[in-house]
Curated annotation (Swiss-Prot):
This is Large ribosomal subunit protein bL25. The keyword Ribonucleoprotein applies. Part of the 50S ribosomal subunit; part of the 5S rRNA/L5/L18/L25 subcomplex. Contacts the 5S rRNA. Binds to the 5S rRNA independently of L5 and L18. SUPFAM superfamilies: Ribosomal protein L25-like. The gene is rplY. CDD domains: Ribosomal_L25_TL5_CTC. GO terms for cellular component: cytosolic large ribosomal subunit. One of its GO terms (biological process) is translation.
Length: 213
């Protein structure tokens, strides 16, 4: 199930280009564009505070939003954003316009559960995450919030592949030519070996020294 949707208010921009974008930022707003669904791109300006908290709140690129552009509501999916390299504030956002049959490629986070039920991890093994996110192709209105990997019963040396993940209907991995690995349970150099019984062999007693006569 996807994140809850939300709404943003925006103003249409008549001017585009670097000069116009700088002017928008000077006025405390963030320039953005809405494109796709066989319609011309629409340049807009968003309130800085609203978009800042959405970007840094998590799940921004996997959550459908509604943008109210001067009273006209447009359903969108955030596709990209740029942050200032020094101050980390948003400087531009791209939105994909969502139509009735829109399908998208989107990176979905991977969550792991039941580490305490993994014999391998209990023995000191380490969960080695190969992919923190997996790219999926799916309907825009059915983007998973995350996918879940259950570690119950996993042992050292085990690999978890995409085929082991139960996916919602209509959600397919973009990589389709192989059963790729998402994580492994690896041994740790600090692992304690299983206890083994050791038998101490007593040193033979020295033969008595013969007394000189």
């Amino acid at each position: 199930m996807s994140h809850d949707t939300y709404e943003l208010k925006a103003e249409a921009r008549e001017q585009v280009g670097k000069g116009s974008a700088r002017a928008v930022r000077r006025n405390g707003k963030v320039p953005a564009v809405i494109y796709g669904d066989k319609q011309p791109p629409l340049a807009i300006a968003l309130t800085y505070k609203d978009i800042y908290y959405k970007i840094h709140g998590g799940g921004f690129l996997t959550t459908i939003a509604t943008i109210d552009v001067d009273g006209k509501k447009i359903q969108v999916l955030p596709k990209d954003f740029q942050l200032d390299p020094v101050k980390d504030f948003p400087v531009h956002v791209d939105f994909l316009r969502i139509g009735k049959d829109t399908e998208v490629n989107v990176d979905v986070p991977v969550h792991f559960i039941n580490e305490d039920k993994s014999p391998g991890i209990k023995r000191g093994g380490v969960l080695n995450i190969v992919r923190h996110e997996v790219e999926f192709h799916c309907p825009a209105n059915a983007i998973p919030e995350f996918i879940t990997i259950d570690l119950t019963g996993t042992n050292i040396g085990d690999s978890i592949h995409i085929s082991a993940v139960q996916l919602p209907a209509g959600v397919k991995p973009v990589i389709s030519d192989r059963d790729f690995t998402i994580a492994t349970i690896a041994g740790s150099s600090a692992m304690k070996p299983e206890a083994e019984e050791t038998v101490e062999v007593a040193a033979p007693e020295a033969a008595p020294v013969a007394e000189e006569k």
